[in-house]
From Swiss-Prot:
HAMAP family: UvrC. The keyword DNA repair applies. Belongs to the UvrC family. The gene is uvrC. GO terms for cellular component: cytoplasm; excinuclease repair complex. GO terms for biological process: nucleotide-excision repair; SOS response. It is found in: Cytoplasm. The UvrABC repair system catalyzes the recognition and processing of DNA lesions. UvrC both incises the 5' and 3' sides of the lesion. The N-terminal half is responsible for the 3' incision and the C-terminal half is responsible for the 5' incision. It comes from Stenotrophomonas maltophilia (strain K279a). The lineage of its organism: Bacteria, Pseudomonadati, Pseudomonadota, Gammaproteobacteria, Lysobacterales. This is UvrABC system protein C.
Amino acid sequence: MTDVPAPAFDGKAFAAQLSTAPGVYRMYAADDTLLYVGKARALRNRVGSYFNGSPKNARIMSMISQIVRMDVTVTRSEAEALLLENQLIKSLSPRYNVSLRDDKTYPHVLLTREDWPRIALHRGPRAIPGRYFGPYPGVTAVRETLNLMHKLFKLRSCEDSVFRNRSRPCLQYQIGRCSAPCVELVAPAEYAESVRRAALFLEGKSDELTRELGEQMQAASEALEFEQAARLRDLISSLRSMQTRQYVDGRAADLDVLAVAMQGSQACVLLLAFRDGRNLGTRPFFPRTNGEESPEEVLAAFVSQYYIEFEPPREILLDREIPDADLLVAALSASAERKVQLKWNVRGERAGYVELASRNAQLTLATELNSRNAQHARSDALREMLGLAEPVKRVECFDISHTLGEATVASCVVFDAAGPVRAQYRRFNISGIEPGDDYAAMRQAIDRRFRRAVEEQGVLPDVLLIDGGAGQLAQAQAALADLGVEGVLLVGVAKGVERRAGHEALVMPDGRELRPGAANPALQFIQQVRDEAHRFAITGHRGRRQKARMTSKLEDIPGIGPRRRASLLKHFGGLVGLKAAGEAEIAKVEGINDALAARIYANLHGLATPDAAE
């Protein structure tokens, strides 16, 4: 029995039965791959335009030829359709859409929601309760902002585990950057007021804050509270001094400047951000394009996708007019619940900002293209050295990091011909092995990564680099063999006798060793991938180790709750001091009797507890 081919998609018939309401349409290929997401003022007219026989460019014709089905979602307005369209593009990355890809997470300033809030740099999901201010163009801008926060408002930055267990103020208090809420040297109401002022500042309301502080200073003077008035005076002076040093243009206020540069199918959108008149710096983005979009289309796609995720400022300057600008303004204003303006062809100081962004976009794109060309050359050299017939599309590398067997973490980094693919990096917390057994750790990590790929028919690398010699390579080979994974070339990266860069030996599955030499571009590519795997593993290990060392297991001991735990840690200055104490010393802590002291000592030293002995 032969398979009956699926009938060709009848686009005209599909469009004819659609309504003229606004909405979003989606196009799918035979393997159910999403080809394209689009919005429409009138669905019937827009969808029908693809199938009316009029001339279209090669990209559109190629897309239409692959369609096997379509579906639509009706919306209440075209602005709502625009928002939905870009949410789908952002989450699904259709093949033929311009898509904003950025592997990096956006840094924010986090002001936590707790009795004594802390202020900190934050990346990643917003899992911690609190207020998030940003995004900022880069980490440097966040750190500069945090530096100001500590100088002006003296908010704590320490982790809760440190905060709860301090018995005296830290260095930050001594240098005037924290008010020491850990030991309550500041009243709760006074600290809460500092938090409120910091939030005003981060919202870009420093002028309002300065006026408010002036009124409070006047009131304190009239009430003869001269010390309070002096503190407020100093704070106002610091605020004004900061404004004088950092404000570029008071009229800039909250403002983003966007410029686009294109060369062939490569595009760079550069964001220059101002908040409360301060220049926060630039950040480049490299959207995925199909090579036939205009710079105006790329910029319009960026605006809609970026500001769906992040709150737009009141004013956005563009280096050119973009399609559907009025619709974008309506959608962004509705989303932000306030007026948002898109402007181009501006004059004066703002024209200078646009020119600056445009020049930086062009320079950044040129630098990126040079980097990608060099990366492609290295990737081609790797293919030639390994004797592969096809281009190397995906390389993965595993590394193991621990401290004497403690907090073992494995990393897996991913590179393609253009460089690192950070969104696909993975870390594995290793458990259930003998501490310090790197072979077992490597085997567990390989098994976990590729077992999931087998079960979910995931993507496999062309080349799998293992940081280690023949022993580590054998573990990876065994793990892949157990899972039935084939078609992946394994290469061990062994340090030379002198353990110097450029002297590495590449261990092949058949036991051969290749020594390309430091000048070989293929080895340079391997070193780049290996070093990134090492960096990613060691940062994960340090984080896990720090968390383990800061988190006491005292509460797992019967009879120890949060209050007794706090008393013990405060009395001994931390877990290290407690572990060094004998049973008699532990029993001197308030609330700890001899039996409980014996149980604590036994648990901390891995001995049989008195209860277990009985």
